[in-house]
């Protein structure tokens, strides 16, 4: 766990600060009340209390996602998110530099529902003054996220519940194709912080939906996202990003296997349908990046 993350973390049981247990290397985080949370050998800390009510992505889904993202297919989305995050972080310097606003250093970027941490890593590359925390309920995802970037850490938690973070401590919170917890996002964001939400548009993977029997994007998704956040945030702008992918049949299988359709598609039927596609398979990738300010 990166030491600069510790001031931001809180015990999920009692809410007190966490510190690394005395060991070399540290194998647990503890609070003054004695609650202890193991650090896995892969580097992530388990801050989940009890059993999560939501099932995280499986090891197979995470392996597919890592393979697909590593090929660069969604890099334009990561780049757009990184640019937005860099613009959202106020210019902050160490006390005594004479420029900007001297505050505690560095800033914290949190990815809620981080998956493998690839998008968080892109943001940290664009914001060199920040450290990052990947939150997810999937341990297979966090095994990768914990090593996604030298300035990143990772923690298992249920993002539908109380986040293991101090009040008003996050500079930028990013949320990519993941559940949104408006009250908690507002609690942990600084008053000058920013929430960046990436969701698929109706065009996303449209060429595959009918041919492969995939889940459709809800036409009312944008309205539902806005409604879920309206009590705690005000819109600060949005942009749409789309590009065309040229995929092999194997890459199409990987793409389907990494997302929610993997839970709802019969593998044998999917394989047969993909085998009937002509290569290269042209697929539209399209997302909306919405920016919000706390109110």
Curated annotation (Swiss-Prot):
Zn(2+) binds at residues 11, 14, 31, 35. Its EC number is 2.1.1.-. One of its GO terms (molecular function) is methyltransferase activity. Signal peptide: none annotated. It comes from the Bacteria. It is an enzyme of class 2 (transferase). GO terms for biological process: methylation; response to antibiotic. S-adenosyl-L-methionine binds at residues 74, 116-117, 204. Keywords: Antibiotic resistance, Metal-binding, Methyltransferase, S-adenosyl-L-methionine, Transferase, Zinc. Coiled coil: none annotated. Belongs to the methyltransferase superfamily. RlmA family. Confers strong resistance to mycinamicin (MM) and tylosin (TY). May function as methyltransferase. This is Putative 23S rRNA (guanine-N(1)-)-methyltransferase.
